[in-house]
Design a protein with these regions (language model features):
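Acidic, metal-ligating active-site segments
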Residues: 1-37
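Long, contiguous domain-sized segments
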Residues: 13, 36-77, 82-259
Length: 259
């Protein structure tokens, strides 16, 4: 019995108004060599986890290559299911991280050079990054400094009342369908390693929910590109009856079927 792992990356390209056939397929990659399967053990990382990290890097590379190869004069959007902020990298040793993050940043650089906007789509986000600012309003001290004013009582600090409040909860009462909230720059520590690919996010009422949208800085600074990308996201959600159809179909393509 051969011990191996299969990464099957779904690829989807949907053209609209161009009379072109869609691309619906997947790229399988089998890992079976000991140097691929067990390299992560030196860092104390289980093989299953390491394969998940490898998949993240491979997905970024495949997306950039695919988007650049099919780019036309028509507006183009590269979409990722989930966050562009890879929190798991923060806990990895430097040698392990250097095998995952550089290919991702290189892929994003290709998209930037091709002027293809990149968006990370998060459904049912549980983030509290923006609502954390409400803690300032609840702080009774002149300058927020938990270590100085609230030592050894973090379970009872005045600002803790906002702990259970999610960003999407606030935005549900503020946004109408089709509207987006303000742009925020994420302060995740791992972004210090992203070089110029700083990640911003906003919340968009897509009709069925409040979705979190993440984009690199080079998309945000191009207002036309950013607005166009958000419009394409809304169109994708509408066509998918509540969820981006391209992402949903990519999931279907990635499923390994017997036959």
């Amino acid at each position: 019995i051969a011990y191996c792992y299969l990464l099957n990356i779904g690829r989807v390209v949907l053209h609209y108004g161009q009379n072109l056939h869609p691309i619906l397929d997947s790229l399988p990659e089998v890992f079976y060599r000991p140097e691929d399967l067990y390299i992560s053990r030196q860092w104390g990382i289980r093989t299953e986890e390491w394969m998940g990290y490898r998949r993240t890097a491979s997905e970024a590379t495949v997306l950039a290559e695919l988007a650049c190869s099919v780019k036309t004069a028509a507006p183009t959007l590269a979409m990722v299911d989930g966050s562009l902020i890879y929190w798991f990298l923060d806990q990895l040793p430097m040698d392990a991280r250097d095998r995952i993050l550089p290919p991702i940043l290189e892929a994003w650089q290709k998209l930037q050079q091709a002027q293809i906007p990149l968006i990370g789509y998060l459904s049912a986000s549980r983030s509290t990054e923006s609502t954390n600012f409400l803690r300032f309003l609840a702080c009774p001290y002149p300058v927020p400094n938990c270590i100085t004013y609230c030592p050894n009582q973090l379970e009872y600090v005045p600002c803790k009342k906002f702990d259970t409040l999610r960003d999407t909860t606030i935005m549900t009462s503020q946004l109408q369908p089709g509207q987006r909230g303000p742009l925020w720059r994420s302060n995740a520590r791992i972004l210090e390693l992203y070089d110029e690919q700083i990640i911003y996010f906003c919340y968009v009422h897509v009709g069925t929910e409040i979705a979190r949208i993440e984009v690199p800085a080079w998309v945000v600074t191009n207002q036309t590109m950013f607005d166009q990308a958000l419009g394409l996201v809304l169109a994708q959600v509408k066509k998918g009856y509540g969820y981006p159809v391209a992402i949903a179909e990519a999931h279907n393509q990635a499923v390994v079927k017997g036959g």
